[in-house]
Amino acid sequence: MANPTSMSSAVHVYRRFVPQPVRSAAATTVPAGVRRKVKGGLARTLSRREARLHRRALRRVRRAGLGQSERRTTAPDGRIAHVHTGLTVDLARRLDHDLVTHALDAAEVPWFAVPALDDRRLCLAVEVRDKGTVRRVLRALLEEHTGYVVSVSPSAADTRETPGSHIKAWKHYGRARVIRLTWLRTDPTEGLWVGEDQGIEIEFWTANTDLPHERLIGPRPNRVQRAVPAEALGIEIGLDRLSGYCDIDGDLGPTVTLENFDVVRLEEISFPVDAVLLWQHPTPWGEELLRAALRSVHQYAPWIDVVHVVAQAEPPAWLEADERISVVRAVPGAEWRLDQLPDLAEHFLLMRPGALLGRPVRPFDYFTPGGGTRPRRGPWNASESFAEWVRAAYSVTGRATGHGYAAGPQPYRADTLTRLGEAGARSLPVPDEQVLSGVPGTHPMDGMAHHFGYVAGHADPSGEASVALHAALPGIGTHLQRLLVRRDVQQLQFFGLGTGEAGSGGGTNAVVRFLHQYYPVPSVFECDRPQTDTEPDRHS
């Protein structure tokens, strides 16, 4: 007997081509057995045609050499994932994009990229008249390189665990206006999982001739425009222009869009952003903090232009000499004069020991398009209100502050530090936060600089989630495990790894183990990063 999906297709074709009066007459005059036989034959015919077209699409995909990974593995939820050495969130996004676009090219389906509603995803548009061809080539692609498909509009996620090579995974495709393809990917340690909240969305655009000039109409609004001229010119555009999470490297391959979508988005940052990392503790745990900070930048902020390591001690031997990293020797307290760093961009992220990025971030998360900073608000209590930096900030600006600033990566403008010095602000004592017995309040330099920028209109404090933990915290392992499972915090800050309580209580070792698990993929800044030689599986 034909499978239910084929029977449903047969019924659809039967209802489409046989008028309702004829069907009503047949229901009363033709025996039920004959009707079942006719419908069954139609279902078998459609099933054979679908299988033939699927094999043809699969041959196209295989000739194009699509779908390569080192090996396959099983994700914790039972789905199939692909293993890639050196995996990053941005690399996974580009792999997904290249897979889909090359498959559409192999099937000779015209497409163009459009700004997605969510920056985490990329979106492609095809005409609705190519919907049948698109389904066949994408189903073949998902068989060659196992992935999953769901309907986005209308929403139907009940197929998220069904491999896209199965025809039942496409049961909502007929009425879908937007679909999403996802591939689960992981690194060889299977500690980093990517793909669940990413994927490639495909919109089906319709031709409209209501006006003298034919237009293409999108199935949903986007961040630029929903209708474009059918004869609009196609242009190449970098993926970083469509998603703020993408690498800004100009050597990476572009995508294709229409000239109508080549506009500056509201949240698009056009200026370069550097990162400044402080190296202060030449100890094993100090090296692990630096290594984790570099990995977090490499993994979650590929748009960072140059990384500057301000070394107040002998730099680790494993730091890789590269055009994207600069190591500068400095004396303690030099962070007050970071604006004097050679070749430092006007805008930069300052990451002190223990400051980490916890998930993918955009430049817009830390800076405004006009060049202002977006520091994180922190706790405010009686002891904080009497801190030395509060009095110093008031003496410089003449304005009282009403909140502190959270620990973690800090957005800075070099000219703010310059103007702060010109205003006569004195350099406050900077504590070594890794030897403090508890979680400190606002860092004096952050409080001074952010308040000064806020008063001048160059800072706009925000409230994104951040977590600060002391290594001597009782039961810290539970907190670390929760962070490892959820991976939903934008920025992290660890304190007290150099205290005796953290060392004797196992907190320092627990944090180091957590860093190894949270950031398993080596960065390009490490010369001792392991290399894995594996034969790629071309039929995964």
From Swiss-Prot:
Q: Superkingdom, according to UniProt?
A: Bacteria
Q: Which InterPro entries match?
A: Stealth (IPR047141), Stealth_CR2 (IPR021520)
* Keyword tags: Exopolysaccharide synthesis, Transferase
Coiled-coil stretches are none
The answer on whether this UniProt entry bears the keyword Cell membrane reads no
Under Gene Ontology molecular function, one entry of this record is: transferase activity, transferring phosphorus-containing groups
Task: Name a single GO biological process.
Answer: polysaccharide biosynthetic process
Q: Which Pfam families did the record assign?
A: Stealth_CR2
Quote the EC number: 2.7.-.-
The similarity annotation says:
Belongs to the stealth family.
Mention any additional remark.
Answer: Stealth proteins are part of a protein family that is conserved from bacteria to higher eukaryotes. Family members were first identified in microbes as proteins that help pathogens to elude the host innate immune system. Microbial stealth proteins are involved in the biosynthesis of exopolysaccharides. Stealth proteins are predicted to function as hexose-1-phosphoryltransferases.
The protein depicted here goes by the name Exopolysaccharide phosphotransferase SCO6022
Which organism is this protein's natural source?
A: Streptomyces coelicolor (strain ATCC BAA-471 / A3(2) / M145)
